[in-house]
Amino acid sequence: MSDEHLAASPGPVDAFDAHGAPVLRRRSEVPGPLLAVLAYVVAYLVLRLGEHGGLERDEAEMVYLARDLRPGYGAQPPLYTWLQWLAFQAFGPDRFALALVKGLSLGAIYMAMYRAALPWVGRAGALAAAASLLLLPQIGWEALRIQTHSVLMMALACGLLWAYGALLARPVAARYAAFGLVAGLGLLAKYNFAILLGGMVGASLLVHEHRVVLWHRRAWIAALVAMVVFLPHAAWMAQHLDAAFGGTLHKMQDGGEHAPYLRRVLHGALGLLSALAAFVAVPAAAFAFAAWSVRADLASRVRTRARDARMARARDGAAGRFFLWLYVLCLAQLGLLVLLGVVGTIKERWLMPVLFSLPLALLVWLPALRRQAPGGRLLRIGAVAGVATLALLPARIWLGPAIGKTVAAHYPYAPLAQALAQRYPGAQAVVANDVMLAGNLLFARAEAPSLQTVAQTVLLDDLLRERRPLRGEVLLVTQDGYPQGLGADFRAAYPAARPLSRARIELPLRFGGRGMLGFTVERMMLPAPGPAPVRAQPALAQAPGPS
């Protein structure tokens, strides 16, 4: 094999198997990527520990939910919440525990993608594929900024691709079990992981070279392990359908559930096209720039001996068809949801389990990009993007107000918790109608022991759904900009509740934020012992943000 061909081949191989899969040599260079990922994670942790102020919605939700272990928590699967609970048990409900779980999940994304790509495109290509994930805005930026469940889902999606490649190389029982384990954990991380899983299973059946290797009796091992992992949560879902799917369906319909069918389909189709364009724009531009130096080779294979060329075509042909079918099947599932009128729009983040592997697929389809020069160029572009997004993470707090942007760190949740503790020392419960407010009040109390009170903090929806008994003084707190009128819903569920007062608390935004933020506090009194609430339809809180 010529040196030129080696540059375009998947990297360090001893041989190719009968199905075109490369047999890799052991390399001692893996610590390099590992050290880079560790540096990225450590930098993220340091920056997060330097932050102050309110938490974004998803992390506030973790503070609220991860106080105990349950088989299910609501509209999102429980795996991330379980991991957050473990971190809280080890380190306490603080910013470090929040950042640690996300930081490790972020690191797992890039390390798993590197290992997944290695047998497909070699070391240079694998480094480029992993670094190129930083060019996907939903992974490189939004995952840093606000997401939780989606970050873990992406790590497991990369892990599933890694497990799939390992199965192709050696389809033994242990690797089928590993594939099933990752599949089950992925479903416990985010429900839309099922789109990727369905697409991967379908693609493996449609590519002959993969089907003959993977589909035999051992495949039941993977299915069985996945079912065992997911079964406890599935049982919870069957008993709590409204809690598991009500909020998700409302979010998918984007407020258009009463719109005519054709309008829903049109909006969904336009949303899908818009999300696709936004998702691929940045990596497409980066790959076009990297490919410019090898543009003459993109239309044809590098000249090699005939036998080597046949092996390369067999290998790359099967891999290329696998990724092509993967995207066709995943997008077909989203298209079906659009045609059924289930979705009012398609959010860009919903495409994460569908298109996360696009950089790797481009490297498979365009072998010339695996060379040292274009691969190194992609690696440098990804590194610059990673450093830039890390720098923007704290900078957005101070630069945001200059362009009229307010972030969660500006919100005065800690001063609000202090004001409530001082003004209402006898309150037994604080009821909020939004998880961002509830979680941040809990977090403010955890960070400041002087604010510890006997008052429990609870979401109104949970209060109504679980029929919790209450007694004594209860505060209904609503943040400006969110649905108001908790009092009517609360009194419908607790007829014995007696209104005492209604007050406004205006607090200045913090850390450079401009303006004031208002909160409404309704004070209620319930006789002791508190009556069990009557059944009431839970109030519809604002749909949860990205996770």
Predicted segments, located by residue:
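Hydrophobic/aromatic-rich transmembrane helices and adjacent perimembrane loops
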Residues: 69, 321, 325, 331, ...
